[in-house]
Amino acid sequence: MAKTLPIMFQGTHSDAGKSVIATAFCRMFAQDGWKTAPFKSQNMSLNSYVTPDGNEIGRAQGIQAEAAGVAARAEMNPILIKPSREHESQIVVLGKPYGNMQAFAYRNEFFHQGLAVIRQSLETLMNEYDRIVIEGAGSPAEVNLNDRELVNMRVARLANAPVVLIGDIERGGVFASLVGTLALLEPEDRKRVVGVIINKFRGDAALLKPGLDWFEQYTGVPVLGVVPHLPDLAIDAEDSLALERFAASSDDKGAIDIAVIRCPKIANFTDIDPLLTEPDCRVRLVTHAGELGEPDVIVLPGSKNTIEDLMYMKKRGLASRIVSLVNEGKTTVVGLCGGYQMLGDVIRDPHGVETPFPEVKGLGLLPVATTLERTKTTVRSEGMLTWAGERFSVRGYEIHMGRSTPLPGYVPLIEIGGRGEGAKREDGRVLGTYMHDLFHNDAFRTAFFNVIRREKGLASSAVRPFHSLKEAAFDRLAAHVRQHVAVERIEQMMRQFQQR
């Protein structure tokens, strides 16, 4: 049996493109016939993914597993950190909530336990897969943190993995960041760096060549590729920094205006990704009432702290403005997970799960009352949804720590196993659900927006299959990276590294 070969991608800073490059290698290895697993020891993100067996991991590793054509599992991201309050995060270990911890306590009290979980998860994957594509986090040169870090060079040592360092040229100063990172590494760790990739390049590659030659001569580290910027890649983003790029690139020409409310604790914002594929829709992020206008659709995404985000909306005039627009019949509101909880009459927090406030009034647009609980629900779900006189099969996943109970006038949105899930107004102007990926259901998404189109006198649209768009995006990304990165050379380095 051939030995498992790992490769690790680290970056000079956050958002250098580690996740995308790792996704490309997952796809390429799978295309070449290797059973491949992604791995990120510790991920800090509010964008998560539910595995088929009901465990919660970082969204990036779930998407990378999809790119590799394998089922996602908890070992692919054994530790997930979900910021919930100032200086406090929920720690998820092997897909299940471990508890809430402050940063100092996590670093000082959890280190050895975390390291043991990471080591065991890595060993499990290396016993079952041919290739392990490992992603680091932030920078490996954080000298103030490296004595107890759990995600960069310590993981490379555990896996005995060669490291490819990624620099983001889009931000400027790419050679300084690459050279500086290499200079700050411990000598033994620096020996693990077999090459660098320069990511997000725009312009004439000939102008970059003198810099590449200088870098290789100065450091002795080869440049393994220069990856040009790849626009309109329909693959879920994980980093909140991606929201900044999304906001900056939103098309203002769409006939259907969709306002996504961006609160400070926004979570699982990939729920809106399919909306970006609708050719006549303009999707924009809104943070206060002055930006809202009179959109056709308002989306309230998930939240890691629903009460804080609801209070944020009230303070910025968004809550009252949304209620007015709905009551005037000028908009349709969709609440997803935390957004659904906000649409109800009240949110109760008797155990102080999110805030010291025992009860907060909701927007009062749906007849439900929510009680936040200590236990978390993480499950994949499937049911039937009736919309515009048609019944649709819908599937998605739930991640929440609350229970919403019906009040008089309640109408369920989805039927799941004989029970009602979510809620809707009979006029269809307000709907809410705990089901993430609702708009990933192509037939329902098309029917939902066709109602809006008819109201605006627009032609109905045919179904656009989002899943096939994502599969095509994986292939497009893999082809792009194959063209611009010395993939065969990296594979040779992986084999040679194991012979040291």
Swiss-Prot record:
Residue intervals of the GATase cobBQ-type domain: 255-444
Superkingdom, taxonomy of origin: Bacteria
InterPro entries per UniProt: Class_I_gatase-like (IPR029062), CobQ/CobB/MinD/ParA_Nub-bd_dom (IPR002586), CobQ_GATase1 (IPR033949), CobQ_N (IPR047045), CobQ_synth (IPR004459), GATase_3 (IPR011698), P-loop_NTPase (IPR027417)
Any one GO molecular function term: catalytic activity
UniProt-listed SUPFAM superfamilies: Class I glutamine amidotransferase-like, P-loop containing nucleoside triphosphate hydrolases
UniProtKB keywords: Cobalamin biosynthesis, Glutamine amidotransferase
Catalytic residues identified in the record: C337 (nucleophile), H436
Annotated pathway: Cofactor biosynthesis; adenosylcobalamin biosynthesis
One biological process term in Gene Ontology: cobalamin biosynthetic process
Function: Catalyzes amidations at positions B, D, E, and G on adenosylcobyrinic A,C-diamide. NH(2) groups are provided by glutamine, and one molecule of ATP is hydrogenolyzed for each amidation.
Record family assignment: Belongs to the CobB/CobQ family. CobQ subfamily.
Protein name: Cobyric acid synthase
Organism: Geobacillus thermodenitrificans (strain NG80-2)
Taxonomic path: Bacteria, Bacillati, Bacillota, Bacilli, Bacillales
Gene field: cobQ
